[in-house]
């Protein structure tokens, strides 16, 4: 299993987008997106790290990205519109590496960006969302989509309250696996190990065919 990540750049309409790639053998891969850039979110976020670790330990190629305007990614914050294109560019980049089974995972704002663009992401097989910020950004656009498989929330999360998320699950996908981490707020300090375990358990229980 590949153990190290390398910095990569890929282009979208003239913008250079930065990512960290850990390339493992085989077709399985995941793109991981970060929380809100205007509140300090980037690809080095603790929750992003936990998601990446769970996937890497199961021999998935992982690609976490900095949205436009973050870190060494060019451009500027685009209210989630251009950020959807950043995700699409990342998915296309993985296809160029001959990855054919691609998951899409996001935390907070990253989960919202992923959901907004999901209908246009034909490459995506499964979607994982950690703390979709339903009390901060509108999610009414999100209709039934069987690709949404796992949602994680903290019991004390006021930005993605589990009670609000619970009411939306039947619309998103009645078969979603919904996990609540007790004692966690939106930032999961001291709780990222539990995120890692839940994502790992989900991956272990799902047959990818590879």
Task: Give, region by region, the residue ranges found by the protein language model.
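Conserved alpha/beta-hydrolase fold motif
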Residues: 101-104, 127
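Gly/Ala-rich beta-loop-alpha elbow adjacent to hydrolase catalytic centers
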Residues: 106-114
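Active-site nucleophile loop of the alpha/beta-hydrolase fold
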Residues: 35-36, 129-137, 154
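Acidic catalytic loop of the alpha/beta-hydrolase fold
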Residues: 155-160, 186-187
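Short beta-strand/loop motif that positions the catalytic acidic residue
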Residues: 145-146, 150-153, 157
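Serine-hydrolase catalytic machinery in alpha/beta-hydrolase-like enzymes
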Residues: 10-12, 16-97
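Catalytic histidine-centered segment of alpha/beta-hydrolase-like enzymes
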Residues: 75, 184-196
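Catalytic histidine neighborhood in serine/cysteine hydrolases
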Residues: 171-187
């Amino acid at each position: 299993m590949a153990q190290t990540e390398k910095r990569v750049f890929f282009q979208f309409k003239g913008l250079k987008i930065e990512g960290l790639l850990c390339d493992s053998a085989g077709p399985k891969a995941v793109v991981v997106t970060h929380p809100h850039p205007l509140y300090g979110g980037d690809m080095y976020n603790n929750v992003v790290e936990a998601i990446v670790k769970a996937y890497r330990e199961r021999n998935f190629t992982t690609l976490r990205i900095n949205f436009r305007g973050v870190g060494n990614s060019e451009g500027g914050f685009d209210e989630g519109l251009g950020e959807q294109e950043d995700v699409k560019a990342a998915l296309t980049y993985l296809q160029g590496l001959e990855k054919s089974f691609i998951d899409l995972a996001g935390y907070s704002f990253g989960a919202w960006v992923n959901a907004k663009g999901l209908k246009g992401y034909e490459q995506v097989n499964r979607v994982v969302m950690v703390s979709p910020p339903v009390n901060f950004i509108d999610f009414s656009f999100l209709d039934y989509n069987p690709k949404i498989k796992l949602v994680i929330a903290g019991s004390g999360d006021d930005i993605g309250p589990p009670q609000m998320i619970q009411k939306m699950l039947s619309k998103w996908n009645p078969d979603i696996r919904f996990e609540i981490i007790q004692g966690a707020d939106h930032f999961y300090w001291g709780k990222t190990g539990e995120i890692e375990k839940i994502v790992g358990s989900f991956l272990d229980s799902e047959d990818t065919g590879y």
